[in-house]
Amino acid sequence: MIDLVFDARRKDLGNFEVGRVLPFHAHRMVGPFTFLDHMGPAAFQPGFPKSADVRPHPHIGLSTLTYLFEGEITHRDSVGSLAVIKPHEVNWMTAGSGITHSERFEGLREHGGRMDGMQAWVALPTEFEEIDPSFTHHEGPAELPYYENGGLKARLIAGEAFGAKSSVPVYSPLFYVHWELEPGVTAALPAEYPERAAYIAAGRVEVDGRELVEAQMAVFAPGETVVFKALERSTVMLLGGEPVGPRFIEWNFVSSSKDRIEQAKADWKAGRMKLPDLDHGEFIPLPE
């Protein structure tokens, strides 16, 4: 039932840590998900330095999905969007042929507080890799279906699962779900998609007689229902879908074509990618 278990790799960004879950050397993608980061958890004091912010930077060939448990982030991008994301909301940014954006912790810098959340990259199918860039923000149960019963709280972040559909405009069959489980509660993930995984964002769960702990991802074999039992209060992120084929990933670029990534690198280095309208005073240079 469990094909593989691995730990998120912690990276210190100076003001807080990020756990890099995907890509993993032995399993680079789950369905169309090419990248998964756990941001925090971390506590910020008012007035922390702006160096913690993510300055403007580019993407191609993917959609980014930001989802928070705690805190807030201010998003600005090159299609003119300005959005403050708060817990249990979704920022969905489709890069397509190319977009730039920044993510800044302006509210936390002013008031202090905690940051804890997830960021995923979802590879676009080949026929959609060069679509026009776009951005949408989603919140509330009308857009992100919510279910609560007997110690389980479930929110469908994106895609389709458990008979529900999120309003996030995805481009291939996928699912992304946030579970909160009280101790002793069991919940099942059906065999609906060929590629499925679970990331334990907090707590401990048991699956198929094996204990999974905080900051671990388990990748599941296809064709079987997966039953989770919470050993303590736990936060579990479920994700997967239909594969879209292999992808090249370099810096912030994802593509089915290595040449396309080289072109994007050249465009960014030469200043040919438009910076966000509302945040164009600085940017992250291409790594050498």
From Swiss-Prot:
InterPro entries, per database record: Pirin, Pirin_C_dom, Pirin_N_dom, RmlC-like_jellyroll, RmlC_Cupin_sf
Q: Which organism is it from?
A: Caulobacter vibrioides (strain ATCC 19089 / CIP 103742 / CB 15) (Caulobacter crescentus)
Q: What is the name listed in the Swiss-Prot or TrEMBL entry for this protein? A: Pirin-like protein CC_3178
The UniProt family comment states: Belongs to the pirin family.
One Pfam match, given by its short name, reads: Pirin_C
Q: Where is the signal peptide?
A: none
